[in-house]
C-alpha cells in the first residue's frame, strides 16, 4: 500500500470532499464558498493524497506582497497524528514566505501550536447564532438619508471601494466572486448619490445536520447602519443564522445582542509579523474565517 503523501493543487472535483469534511467539523460551509476560495488563488489551495485516498487540505491565500492568510486546514480523522498535517502546513507557509504579515483564525486548542510557529494572538472572534422565524426585525433607531438597496441597486465599484478601506488588504477578485455568486443575497446602504455606506451578504450554509444561513461580511459607517443592514439580511430567512464578529469592534456585540443573536463559540485571530494597522470599527461581521 502506498504511504507517500502527495500534495497537489486543489481540483474542482476535490471540492465535495472538503465540503463534507468542513461540514462534519461544524464549520458550516456556505454554498459556493470553496469554489470562490479556489478561484481567488488557484496556486494557494492544496489536497494531500495517499494513493487514491484524500488525507487533508489547506489554503494559503496570497492577497498581495504585503498580506496572506492561512485557512481551511483539515486532516481527515483516520489520517491524523501521522505527520501529514505538518506537511500540508509547511506547503502553505512556504507559499506565503517573504510576506510581512500572515494571518489565520485559530481554535483555542491550537493557540500554543501556532505560537510555536511565530503567530501571536490579536483578538477574539465570536460566532453568534439566531434562530430566525423569517420576520423583519425593526432596528431601534431610524436611519435618515440612506436607502437599504439590494446588491443590484448599487454599483460594484462603490462596494469594492468601501470594502478596500476596511480590510487589511484589498480583495477585488474575491469580493467580485463573493458579491455575484447566485447562492447569496447582498444588501447595501446607499445615499441619494448612490455612494456606499455599508453592505452585507447572507448565504445558505451546510450545518452538521440540515442547512442554515451565514451572514458575512457586514460593514457599515455606524452601528445604526449595521443594525439596519442586519435587519434586511435576516428578513425572510428562516432557521439557524450564524455570523462571526471581530473582537476589535466592541460595538458589534451589542448590535448582535439587540438583534436576538447569542454567542455560541470563539476563535482567535492570530498574526505572524506586523499586524494590520487599519481600524475595523466599521466591520461587524467577517466574510469567512477561511480567507480572513
Stretch-by-stretch model annotation:
Residues 47, 52-61, 68-74, 194-208, ...:
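Conserved beta-strand in the GNAT
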Amino acid at each position: 500500500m502506498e504511504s507517500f503523501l502527495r500534495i497537489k493543487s486543489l481540483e474542482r472535483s476535490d471540492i465535495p470532499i472538503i465540503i463534507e469534511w468542513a461540514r462534519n467539523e461544524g464549520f458550516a460551509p456556505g454554498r459556493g464558498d470553496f469554489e470562490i476560495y479556489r478561484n481567488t488563488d488557484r496556486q494557494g489551495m492544496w489536497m494531500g493524497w495517499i494513493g487514491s485516498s484524500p488525507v487533508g487540505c489547506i489554503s494559503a491565500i496570497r492577497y498581495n506582497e504585503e498580506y496572506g492568510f492561512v485557512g481551511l486546514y483539515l486532516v481527515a480523522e483516520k489520517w491524523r497524528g501521522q505527520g501529514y498535517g505538518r506537511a500540508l502546513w509547511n506547503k502553505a507557509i512556504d507559499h506565503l514566505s517573504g510576506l510581512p504579515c500572515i494571518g489565520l483564525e485559530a481554535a483555542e486548542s491550537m493557540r500554543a501550536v501556532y505560537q510555536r510557529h511565530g503567530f501571536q494572538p490579536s483578538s477574539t472572534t465570536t460566532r453568534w447564532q439566531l434562530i430566525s422565524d423569517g420576520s423583519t426585525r425593526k432596528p431601534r433607531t431610524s436611519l435618515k438619508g440612506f436607502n437599504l438597496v439590494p446588491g443590484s441597486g448599487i454599483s460594484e465599484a462603490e462596494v469594492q471601494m468601501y470594502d478596500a478601506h476596511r480590510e487589511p488588504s484589498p480583495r477585488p477578485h474575491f469580493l467580485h466572486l463573493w458579491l455575484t455568486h447566485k447562492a447569496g443575497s447582498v444588501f447595501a446602504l446607499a445615499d441619494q448619490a448612490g455612494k456606499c455606506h455599508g453592505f452585507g451578504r447572507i448565504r445558505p450554509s451546510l450545518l452538521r445536520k440540515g442547512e442554515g444561513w451565514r451572514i458575512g461580511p457586514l460593514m457599515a459607517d455606524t452601528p445604526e447602519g449595521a443594525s439596519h443592514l442586519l435587519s434586511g439580511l435576516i428578513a425572510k430567512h428562516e432557521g439557524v443564522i450564524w455570523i462571526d464578529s471581530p473582537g476589535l469592534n466592541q460595538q458589534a456585540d451589542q448590535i448582535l445582542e439587540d438583534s436576538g443573536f447569542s454567542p455560541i463559540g470563539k476563535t482567535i485571530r492570530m498574526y505572524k509579523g506586523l499586524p494590520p494597522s487599519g481600524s475595523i470599527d466599521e466591520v461587524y461581521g467577517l466574510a469567512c474565517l477561511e480567507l480572513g
